[in-house]
Amino acid sequence: MNMLLVLLVNSILSLLLILIAFWLPQLNMYNEKANSYECGFDPMGSARLPFSMKFFLVAITFLLFDLEIALLLPLPWAIQMTNINTMTLTSFILISVLALGLAYEWLQKGLEWTE
């Protein structure tokens, strides 16, 4: 009975707060409130600003190689495993794939900022 009462009160309170949050902002609508916040930029301007694709590729490459650190961090704890050959082979394969990816990026001139 006590649990049912707590569940009922929580449900009613949650529903009441959701309804207040839904209807309260609609009471006083004005023009500035309806506009999106664009950090000082003109919200009616073009959304298609020029973006450097080279910067995007360097950022993605950084994220991929940064993920390497997250994958290699557990290695000191994995050394304490009984089957160290599996851990060594796995880390060697991971580092080899990353080295091949770095070599490919280098050969494709993906690491050069200027063209």
From Swiss-Prot:
Catalyzed reactions per annotation: a ubiquinone + NADH + 5 H(+)(in) = a ubiquinol + NAD(+) + 4 H(+)(out)
Q: Please verify whether the record's keywords include Cell inner membrane.
A: no
Q: What class of enzyme is it?
A: translocase
A cellular component term, taken from the record's GO annotations: mitochondrial inner membrane
One short Pfam name that applies is: Oxidored_q4
- Keywords, sorted A to Z: Electron transport, Membrane, Mitochondrion, Mitochondrion inner membrane, NAD, Respiratory chain, Translocase, Transmembrane, Transmembrane helix, Transport, Ubiquinone
Q: Does the keyword NAD apply?
A: yes
Q: What does this protein do?
A: Core subunit of the mitochondrial membrane respiratory chain NADH dehydrogenase (Complex I) which catalyzes electron transfer from NADH through the respiratory chain, using ubiquinone as an electron acceptor. Essential for the catalytic activity of complex I.
Q: What is this protein called?
A: NADH-ubiquinone oxidoreductase chain 3
Naturally occurring in which organism (per UniProt)? Peromyscus eremicus (Cactus mouse)
Q: Which gene encodes it?
A: MT-ND3
